Swiss-Prot record:
One of its GO terms (biological process) is CDP-diacylglycerol biosynthetic process. Belongs to the CDS family. It is a multi-pass membrane protein. It is found in: Cell membrane. One of its GO terms (molecular function) is phosphatidate cytidylyltransferase activity. Its main location: membrane. Keywords: Cell membrane, Lipid biosynthesis, Lipid metabolism, Membrane, Nucleotidyltransferase, Phospholipid biosynthesis, Phospholipid metabolism, Transferase, Transmembrane, Transmembrane helix. It comes from the Bacteria. This is Phosphatidate cytidylyltransferase. The chain crosses the membrane at residues 27-47, 67-87, 96-116, 124-144, 150-170, 202-222, 232-252, 277-297. It catalyses: a 1,2-diacyl-sn-glycero-3-phosphate + CTP + H(+) = a CDP-1,2-diacyl-sn-glycerol + diphosphate.
C-alpha cells in the first residue's frame, strides 16, 4: 500500500516537473535564439534581472532564518540593477566607450557603500549586514552576469550566434545532468552520496548525470553549424567539458542543499513544480563560471569576456 502511494506521488510530481520544465525550456531556447534582436535582448535583460532579484531574495530569506538580516529586499534590488546594467553593457558594448563593462561593478561598489551607512543602527551592524548582503548578491548575480557575457560575447564578430550556441550548450548539458540524475537516481539509486545534506543524491544518479551531460555534448557537436565550426572546440574537449559540467552541476546542487539544510528548509521558495529560483539555478551557478573561463582561454581572440 505504501509503495503504491509512494509511486503515485512520484509519478504525479514527475509529470508536473516534466510539463513545467518543458514549457520553460522551450520558451528559453526560443528567447535565446532571438536574443540578438533589440526586443528580445530587452526581454532577456528583464528576465535575467528578475531571476537575479528573486534568487538573491531567496538567499537573503535563508540568511534571515539564521541571522537578524534586514536587507533582503535591498540586496534583491541591487542584484536586479546590477544585472540590468550588465545586459545593457554586454549587448551594446560596441556602442559605448572602452571599459564600459566596469559600470555594473561601480554601481555595486557604491550600492554596498550606501548599505554601510544604512546598517549602522541595525543589530548586525555595518560589517555583518554588508558582508551578508554582498554574499547574497554575488552568489546569484555573478554567474548570471557571466552567462550574459557568454551569450553576447561574440556580437562583434561575423558569427554573433556563437554566443547563443554556447549559452544553449551550457544550459542543455547542465540541466541534462539534473534530469538524468533525477530519473536514474529515483529509479535505481540506493547508495547515497551525502545523506545528511541531500538525501536524494545517489551514486547512480551522479554517474547518470555525468553520462547525460556527455551525451548532450556529443549531440551538440554532431549538429554544429558549419558556418562557425572553426570557433567551437574539438569533440574531445566538448566531451571533457560535458563531464566537467556534469560534476560542477552536481556540486552546485550540493552547495545550495547545504544552505537549505542549514536554514532547515526543503525548497528555497514555494513556486509550484519548481521549488524556488535557486532550485532552478543551483547547478548553473557553478557551471557557468567554468564555461566562461574556458571561453576566455580557448577563444581569447574573438570572445569579449
Amino acid at each position: 500500500m505504501f509503495d503504491s502511494d509512494h509511486n503515485s506521488i512520484f509519478q504525479s510530481d514527475l509529470c508536473q516537473r516534466l510539463v513545467v520544465h518543458s514549457i520553460l525550456l522551450t520558451f528559453l531556447v526560443i528567447l535565446l535564439c532571438t536574443s540578438l534582436y533589440p526586443s528580445s535582448a530587452f526581454i532577456v535583460g528583464l528576465l535575467s534581472s528578475a531571476c537575479a532579484a528573486l534568487g538573491t531574495y531567496e538567499m537573503g530569506a535563508m540568511v534571515r532564518i539564521k541571522f537578524p538580516f534586514s536587507f533582503t529586499r535591498y540586496s534583491a534590488l541591487g542584484s536586479a540593477i546590477f544585472i540590468a546594467l550588465t545586459c545593457l553593457t554586454a549587448r551594446c558594448k560596441m556602442c559605448f566607450p572602452e571599459h564600459i563593462d566596469l559600470l555594473p561593478w561601480f554601481f555595486l561598489f557604491f550600492w554596498t557603500i550606501r548599505l554601510v551607512f544604512k546598517s549602522r543602527h541595525y543589530k548586525l551592524g555595518p560589517i555583518g549586514s554588508t558582508g551578508l548582503a554582498l554574499f547574497c548578491m554575488l552568489y546569484v548575480s555573478v554567474p548570471i552576469r557571466l552567462f550574459l557575457h557568454i551569450l553576447y560575447g561574440f556580437v562583434h564578430t561575423d558569427t554573433p550566434f556563437v554566443g547563443i550556441w554556447w549559452a544553449i550548450f551550457l544550459i542543455a548539458t547542465t540541466k541534462s545532468s539534473d534530469i538524468f540524475g533525477y530519473f536514474f537516481g529515483k529509479a535505481f539509486g540506493k547508495k547515497r552520496i551525502a545523506p545528511v545534506i541531500s538525501p536524494n543524491k545517489t551514486v547512480v544518479g551522479f554517474i547518470a548525470g555525468c553520462c547525460g551531460s556527455i551525451l548532450v555534448s556529443l549531440l551538440f557537436y554532431s549538429h554544429l553549424p558549419k558556418a562557425f565550426a572553426d570557433q567551437i572546440a574539438v569533440p574531445w574537449i566538448l566531451i571533457a567539458l560535458g563531464t566537467v559540467l556534469g560534476v560542477s552541476g552536481f556540486f552546485g546542487d550540493i552547495i545550495e542543499s547545504t544552505f537549505k539544510r542549514d536554514a532547515q528548509i526543503k525548497n528555497s521558495s514555494d513556486l509550484e513544480s519548481i521549488g524556488g529560483m535557486l532550485d532552478v539555478l543551483d547547478s548553473l551557478l557553478l557551471s557557468t563560471p567554468i564555461v566562461y573561463a574556458i571561453l576566455l582561454i580557448t577563444q581569447n581572440r574573438t570572445f569579449l569576456g
